[in-house]
Amino acid sequence: MKEIVLAGGCFWGVEEYMSRIKGIVETKVGYANGIKENPSYKVVCSGTTGHAEACYIKYDESIISLEELLNKFWNIIDPTVLNKQGNDRGTQYRTGIFYLNEKDLNIITESKSREQKNYKKAIVTEVEPLKCFYEAEEYHQKYLKKNPEGYCHIHLD
Protein backbone atom coordinates (compact mmCIF):
# COMPACT_ATOMS: atom_id res chain seq x y z
CA MET A 1 0.00 0.00 0.00
CA LYS A 2 1.10 3.56 -0.72
CA GLU A 3 0.12 6.85 0.86
CA ILE A 4 -0.25 10.47 -0.25
CA VAL A 5 -1.92 13.56 1.21
CA LEU A 6 -3.79 15.86 -1.18
CA ALA A 7 -5.14 19.34 -0.46
CA GLY A 8 -7.78 20.60 -2.87
CA GLY A 9 -9.88 23.13 -1.03
CA CYS A 10 -12.61 21.95 1.32
CA PHE A 11 -11.61 18.46 2.39
CA TRP A 12 -15.16 17.07 2.40
CA GLY A 13 -15.39 16.95 -1.39
CA VAL A 14 -11.83 15.77 -1.94
CA GLU A 15 -12.41 12.85 0.42
CA GLU A 16 -15.75 11.89 -1.14
CA TYR A 17 -14.35 12.08 -4.67
CA MET A 18 -11.23 10.07 -3.84
CA SER A 19 -13.13 7.45 -1.83
CA ARG A 20 -15.10 6.55 -4.98
CA ILE A 21 -11.98 5.66 -7.00
CA LYS A 22 -11.16 2.00 -7.46
CA GLY A 23 -7.95 1.15 -5.64
CA ILE A 24 -8.40 3.68 -2.83
CA VAL A 25 -8.24 1.68 0.38
CA GLU A 26 -8.64 4.39 3.02
CA THR A 27 -9.28 8.13 3.28
CA LYS A 28 -9.16 10.51 6.25
CA VAL A 29 -9.53 14.27 6.34
CA GLY A 30 -7.28 16.46 8.40
CA TYR A 31 -4.91 19.36 8.64
CA ALA A 32 -1.53 19.20 6.88
CA ASN A 33 1.78 21.02 7.11
CA GLY A 34 1.01 23.71 9.64
CA ILE A 35 2.79 24.99 12.73
CA LYS A 36 0.33 24.21 15.55
CA GLU A 37 0.11 20.73 17.05
CA ASN A 38 -3.27 19.01 16.87
CA PRO A 39 -5.29 22.08 15.84
CA SER A 40 -9.07 22.29 15.87
CA TYR A 41 -11.13 23.16 12.80
CA LYS A 42 -11.96 26.55 14.32
CA VAL A 43 -8.28 27.39 14.85
CA VAL A 44 -7.31 26.21 11.34
CA CYS A 45 -10.08 28.41 9.89
CA SER A 46 -8.57 31.42 11.66
CA GLY A 47 -5.72 31.24 9.14
CA THR A 48 -3.06 31.42 11.86
CA THR A 49 -1.82 27.81 11.89
CA GLY A 50 -0.54 27.40 8.33
CA HIS A 51 -2.41 24.11 7.86
CA ALA A 52 -4.15 23.09 4.66
CA GLU A 53 -7.40 21.14 4.76
CA ALA A 54 -6.25 17.85 3.25
CA CYS A 55 -7.17 14.26 2.56
CA TYR A 56 -4.91 11.38 3.55
CA ILE A 57 -5.18 8.61 0.96
CA LYS A 58 -3.98 5.03 1.20
CA TYR A 59 -4.11 3.27 -2.15
CA ASP A 60 -3.26 -0.03 -3.79
CA GLU A 61 -0.65 0.69 -6.43
CA SER A 62 -1.46 -2.58 -8.21
CA ILE A 63 -4.91 -1.08 -8.99
CA ILE A 64 -4.17 2.64 -9.39
CA SER A 65 -0.80 4.30 -9.89
CA LEU A 66 0.25 7.58 -8.31
CA GLU A 67 0.27 9.12 -11.79
CA GLU A 68 -3.36 8.07 -12.38
CA LEU A 69 -4.36 9.32 -8.93
CA LEU A 70 -2.74 12.70 -9.59
CA ASN A 71 -4.51 12.97 -12.96
CA LYS A 72 -7.82 12.56 -11.12
CA PHE A 73 -6.73 15.15 -8.54
CA TRP A 74 -5.87 17.74 -11.23
CA ASN A 75 -9.39 17.25 -12.64
CA ILE A 76 -11.09 18.44 -9.44
CA ILE A 77 -9.01 21.53 -8.60
CA ASP A 78 -8.04 24.82 -10.16
CA PRO A 79 -4.29 24.63 -9.56
CA THR A 80 -3.68 28.22 -10.72
CA VAL A 81 -5.59 29.89 -7.88
CA LEU A 82 -3.91 30.54 -4.53
CA ASN A 83 -5.84 30.00 -1.29
CA LYS A 84 -9.23 29.47 -2.97
CA GLN A 85 -11.27 26.61 -4.40
CA GLY A 86 -14.93 27.06 -5.25
CA ASN A 87 -16.50 29.53 -2.81
CA ASP A 88 -13.95 28.77 -0.10
CA ARG A 89 -11.19 31.30 0.57
CA GLY A 90 -8.28 31.25 2.98
CA THR A 91 -4.83 29.71 3.31
CA GLN A 92 -6.38 26.47 4.56
CA TYR A 93 -8.00 26.03 1.13
CA ARG A 94 -4.76 26.11 -0.86
CA THR A 95 -3.93 23.18 -3.10
CA GLY A 96 -1.07 20.86 -2.31
CA ILE A 97 0.48 17.47 -2.87
CA PHE A 98 2.23 16.28 0.28
CA TYR A 99 4.28 13.14 -0.19
CA LEU A 100 5.39 10.61 2.41
CA ASN A 101 7.94 8.85 0.21
CA GLU A 102 10.80 10.77 -1.43
CA LYS A 103 10.64 8.29 -4.34
CA ASP A 104 7.26 9.77 -5.31
CA LEU A 105 8.67 13.26 -5.89
CA ASN A 106 9.75 12.56 -9.48
CA ILE A 107 6.30 11.29 -10.46
CA ILE A 108 4.67 14.29 -8.77
CA THR A 109 6.90 16.91 -10.43
CA GLU A 110 6.50 15.26 -13.85
CA SER A 111 2.72 15.22 -13.38
CA LYS A 112 2.70 18.89 -12.38
CA SER A 113 4.84 19.80 -15.42
CA ARG A 114 2.48 17.94 -17.76
CA GLU A 115 -0.53 19.61 -16.15
CA GLN A 116 1.07 23.06 -16.51
CA LYS A 117 0.78 22.71 -20.32
CA ASN A 118 -3.01 23.00 -19.90
CA TYR A 119 -2.79 26.49 -18.35
CA LYS A 120 -1.49 29.92 -19.31
CA LYS A 121 -1.18 30.93 -15.64
CA ALA A 122 1.37 29.22 -13.40
CA ILE A 123 0.27 26.31 -11.25
CA VAL A 124 0.53 27.30 -7.58
CA THR A 125 -0.18 23.87 -6.10
CA GLU A 126 2.42 23.16 -3.42
CA VAL A 127 4.56 20.05 -3.71
CA GLU A 128 6.22 19.31 -0.38
CA PRO A 129 7.09 16.43 1.91
CA LEU A 130 4.38 15.82 4.49
CA LYS A 131 5.62 17.46 7.69
CA CYS A 132 2.53 16.77 9.78
CA PHE A 133 -1.04 15.56 9.41
CA TYR A 134 -3.58 15.88 12.19
CA GLU A 135 -6.82 14.01 11.72
CA ALA A 136 -9.83 16.33 11.72
CA GLU A 137 -12.68 16.00 14.16
CA GLU A 138 -14.95 12.97 13.72
CA TYR A 139 -17.86 14.99 12.33
CA HIS A 140 -15.68 15.93 9.33
CA GLN A 141 -14.79 12.31 8.49
CA LYS A 142 -16.87 10.97 5.56
CA TYR A 143 -18.93 14.15 5.90
CA LEU A 144 -20.65 13.95 2.52
CA LYS A 145 -21.51 10.27 3.04
CA LYS A 146 -23.23 11.24 6.29
CA ASN A 147 -24.66 14.48 4.80
CA PRO A 148 -25.26 13.87 1.07
CA GLU A 149 -26.84 17.30 0.64
CA GLY A 150 -23.87 19.03 2.27
CA TYR A 151 -21.85 21.75 0.52
CA CYS A 152 -19.26 20.60 -1.99
CA HIS A 153 -17.26 22.64 -4.49
CA ILE A 154 -16.50 19.50 -6.51
CA HIS A 155 -19.02 18.09 -8.98
CA LEU A 156 -19.43 14.51 -7.78
CA ASP A 157 -22.03 13.35 -10.33
Swiss-Prot record:
The keyword Oxidoreductase applies. GO terms for biological process: cellular response to oxidative stress; protein modification process. GO terms for molecular function: L-methionine-(S)-S-oxide reductase activity; peptide-methionine (S)-S-oxide reductase activity. Keywords: Oxidoreductase. Its EC number is 1.8.4.11. It comes from the Bacteria. InterPro entries: Met_Sox_Rdtase_MsrA_dom, Met_Sox_Rdtase_MsrA_sf, MsrA_MetSO_reductase. One of its GO terms (cellular component) is cytoplasm. The active site is at 10. The keyword Oxidoreductase applies. Has an important function as a repair enzyme for proteins that have been inactivated by oxidation. Catalyzes the reversible oxidation-reduction of methionine sulfoxide in proteins to methionine. Belongs to the MsrA Met sulfoxide reductase family. This is Peptide methionine sulfoxide reductase MsrA. The gene is msrA.
